[in-house]
Curated annotation (Swiss-Prot):
It holds the Pfam family Fimbrial. It comes from Escherichia coli (strain K12). GO terms for cellular component: pilus. The gene is ycbU. It comes from the Bacteria. Keywords: Signal. This is Uncharacterized fimbrial-like protein YcbU. The keyword Cell inner membrane does not apply. The operon is cryptic under classical laboratory conditions, but is functional when constitutively expressed. InterPro entries: Adhesion_dom_fimbrial (IPR000259), Adhesion_dom_fimbrial_sf (IPR036937), Adhesion_dom_sf (IPR008966), Bact_Fimbrial_Adh_Pro (IPR050263).
Length: 180
């Protein structure tokens, strides 16, 4: 009787083993591999990455009519180490648009001190042509050469309505390049 029980246990063990071996056939696992191989672009010079630009201090009486502008301050962006294959880049200045003039950059309380000027926004200009660069709109190809480049722009205040009021006139502007 003892031999019969051992025999039955051995048969049961091999039966279970056979079931697991039969079920453990090859499994196929699907993996998706992705990434990019891109040409070397350019680097933004450290001194250009975080800039504090003082446009100036102006009397509010200079902004009593709509579309009045201040003198401009330079905004230079140094681009270094551009690869030989880079011929240019599309440029995008982005930020919060002014509600009355959406092509202009809205003043924002960057320091939390309040007392914001009203009826005034920041206008971005191409330094060479003096043409406005609309905020949040990609500008077509800006030529770049291999090596180092300086992109030259200007910023100025522009009144968006008659009767602007004085105060804090700070704003935050972002800059992006899409290489060609």
């Amino acid at each position: 009787m003892k031999k019969k029980t051992i025999f039955q246990c051995v048969i049961l063990f091999f039966s279970i083993l056979n079931i697991h071996v039969g079920m453990a056939g090859p499994e196929q696992v699907s993996m998706h591999i992705y990434g990019n191989v891109v040409d070397q672009g350019c680097d933004v010079a450290t001194k250009s990455a975080l800039q504090n630009i003082h446009i100036g201090d102006f009397n509010i009486s200079d902004f009593q009519a709509a579309n009045t502008v201040s003198t401009a301050a330079d905004l230079n962006i140094d681009i270094t180490g551009c690869a030989a294959g880079i011929t240019g880049a599309d440029v995008l200045f982005s930020g919060e648009a002014d509600t009355l003039a959406p092509t202009l950059l809205k003043l924002t309380d960057t320091g939390g001190s309040g007392g914001m000027a009203t009826g005034i926004a920041v206008q971005i200009l191409d330094a060479q042509s003096q043409q406005e660069i609309p905020l949040n709109q990609v500008q077509p190809l800006t030529p770049l050469k291999a090596g180092d480049n300086t992109l030259k722009y200007q910023l100025r205040y522009k009144s968006t309505k008659a009767g602007a009021t004085g105060g804090n006139a700070t704003a935050v502007l972002y800059f992006d390049l899409v290489y060609q």
